[in-house]
Amino acid sequence: MRILHTSDWHLGQNFYSKSREAEHQAFLDWLLETAQTHQVDAIIVAGDVFDTGSPPSYARTLYNRFVVNLQQTGCHLVVLAGNHDSVATLNESRDIMAFLNTTVVASAGHAPQILPRRDGTPGAVLCPIPFLRPRDIITSQAGLNGIEKQQHLLAAITDYYQQHYADACKLRGDQPLPIIATGHLTTVGASKSDAVRDIYIGTLDAFPAQNFPPADYIALGHIHRAQIIGGMEHVRYCGSPIPLSFDECGKSKYVHLVTFSNGKLESVENLNVPVTQPMAVLKGDLASITAQLEQWRDVSQEPPVWLDIEITTDEYLHDIHRKIQALTESLPVEVLLVRRSREQRERVLASQQRETLSELSVEEVFNRRLALEELDESQQQRLQHLFTTTLHTLAGEH
């Protein structure tokens, strides 16, 4: 039995006004080819198929087309909802997808099922667990403090997993089949990126890996970096197939090829997802940024490299966007973001904490707040104009 474990596609993501359609199409084409090359029996998508609950039409088209194309290979597809996915959006096509060799699990309450091989014979028992919304697995109790609510939710998630595993064992019976569980959540020790949202805000930071049942493989989603959890080879995040934030660029992206033999996990192989949209982060003062940009001088690059430029100088030049534009206009790059480095923003805030509002004019307060935002020059000018207009209007009323 062979499966491909993938997650966090985030189809339809708007990345600093840029579409990811071409990247996602290339990934899905590669995934289809990979499934055929390795004669995979099933593909498990562990949540966040879409980036929003109301994905754009092109994202739905990518999803639907992939399902249709995969159906022709005999490979079964399992789609589980993540915290970004809408239950209603996934469920609206669930019945049709069932006729296309695809199982859609959008919410809690789905019992374990037999996952077939390509030839139709039983290959594994699947505990199809999506992102567990608290309202689906616990009832609200009045009078609980924050710690008690956290413990209540932790116990409910643990019980849900343990019950599903017990049901899977009953379904397996005496058959030599592996048990595969899924999940879309943060586990203790997982390394997150900037694009990952906290999903149990104020109640549960992370789920302890030791609370998972002893399934043969646990396919996790939500964390965008591939990693093994708790030193356990069978508990893994595969990560997203493309970088979803600039702090993910430069790191390899994977899909896991998981092989089972005689009802047990045999191997997990990391398959590198090809990069189709180069991205880079440049850090330094203006002189350093200028030097770093030279690496693309006289280079033929298609598509252009998407850049995040972090300025580390103490003085954040007011015309930095214009200077960066002049430096890059003849290079095969596209600057999506120009900002102070995080360390610099923190230093600015720390230095300003010694001042009080009474020492600053209204204009100074606004300008300092505006400088902390990651906006391009036109956006800054528009906000400055709106602020000035509002200030003059208020002055005229008093």
Language-model segments: residues:
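N-terminal active-site segment of His-dependent metallophosphoesterases
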Residues: 1-68, 72, 380, 385, ...
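Active-site neighborhood of phospho(di)ester-bond hydrolases with catalytic His/Asp-centered motifs
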Residues: 6-7, 43-48, 76-83, 103-108, ...
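Accessory, non-catalytic peripheral segments of nucleic-acid enzymes
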Residues: 37, 42, 260-398
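Catalytic-core regions built around general acid/base machinery
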Residues: 62-74, 204-214
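Conserved catalytic scaffold of divalent metal-dependent phosphoesterases
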Residues: 92-202
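Binuclear metal-dependent phosphoesterase catalytic core
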Residues: 112-123, 129, 235-299
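Conserved beta-sheet core of the metallophosphoesterase superfamily
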Residues: 187-189, 193-264
